[in-house]
Amino acid sequence: MFQGSSALTLDAKGRISIPTRHRDALMDRAEGRLTLTRHPDGCLLVYPRPEWEEKRAQIAAFPMSARALQRLLLGNAQDVDIDGSGRVLIAPELRNASGMTRDVMLLGMGAHFELWDAASLARREAEDLAQGMPDVLNQFSF
């Protein structure tokens, strides 16, 4: 399971270096094979390929009323591999769609990651905190 955040930098070719603490697990779990796609919140989702295969089947089975979401998730999905230096290429289409510039944040979200433009994530977190805690946390103790 993946957790925690990592501040990363896109290189001139649009690649990020996967943090070592995640790289080994991704190599063991998915042989370094990942799938990236867009998320409605404006970030990119990064899945180890085996987990993505399960999600892809679930998304493909959505009813016609969810066609726009299918188009966003499946139509933008791109398979990538971690290279020998531990880097992953983020396609220009995905970088542009998510507003990624140079500084990005990789967030471990359990079985997958979210990849955000750093400034966009900071704005989003500030907006989310300003709205207060969701009701689901009323029964949760930290």
From Swiss-Prot:
Its main location: cytoplasm. It holds the Pfam family MraZ. SUPFAM superfamilies: AbrB/MazE/MraZ-like. It is found in: Cytoplasm, Nucleoid. PROSITE patterns: SPOVT_ABRB. Keywords: Cytoplasm, DNA-binding, Repeat, Transcription, Transcription regulation. It comes from the Bacteria. One of its GO terms (cellular component) is nucleoid. GO terms for biological process: negative regulation of DNA-templated transcription initiation. Residues 5-51, 77-120 form the SpoVT-AbrB domain. Forms oligomers. This is Transcriptional regulator MraZ. It comes from Bordetella pertussis (strain Tohama I / ATCC BAA-589 / NCTC 13251).
